[in-house]
Amino acid sequence: MAIHLIIFLRPEKGITLPQQYNHIVQAAIYNSIDTALATFLHQYGFTDGNRAFKMFAFSLLLGKYRINKEEKTITFEDEVQLTLSSPLGDFCQSLANTLLSRGTLKLGSTDVPVEKVYAQQFKVDKEEVHLKTLSPVVLYSTLLRPDGRKYTCYFQPGEPDYARLLNSNLKKKFKAFYGTEPTEEEVEVRPLGRQRMHLVNYKGTIIKGYAGRLHLSGPVELLQLAVDCGLGGKNAQGFGCVEVVNERKGTTP
């Protein structure tokens, strides 16, 4: 079953992390699922012949925080929420079981107590969906300069290439995960309100993404996959996690 896991963390004396913490959360996730599954996802993933997809996404850490600009750290002093999504039932179940039995999530060198874990299932049953990003969506192309050097061009909601790349990414994920060709129909994307640009330093690489609300319309199977495994690229690095707005169904594992 494809679900969203919402993990509630309760640091006893707060927790301080580097401002650029995506890789720390990513490592914590891999260290909290079945070893064989973690190895498969990390080393192989699901492929469409050219590109491999890990088939999970995670949000920013949400909670009250303060930033130390000099030390480039962020400190969470109270409850912290982390959301993950995946169409992989084994991934969700393994993560939930580990967190509930272990009782902690190891972020860097700190074992942070897990207060509770909620599960939510978002079922897309019509050809449109209103989404809120929980981590920035990244869509880009790698291009060549006249001298032959490569550079990365990032796109924002509203640009034609944004919609084109979003569709291409979704269809590649569909083929990689289900092993069948996706529909030729396209997903239309409409930004709702202001889209906030985020610059993230992931292990020395600067990545640009955009966060906000989006209205998607198109084939239900592609919309469902977008909700389940995230929008755009680099989902397993902490980008493109989304939730359905005003259409929640909640259960607790």
Walk through the language-model features, giving the residues of each:
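RNA-interacting cores
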Residues: 1-253
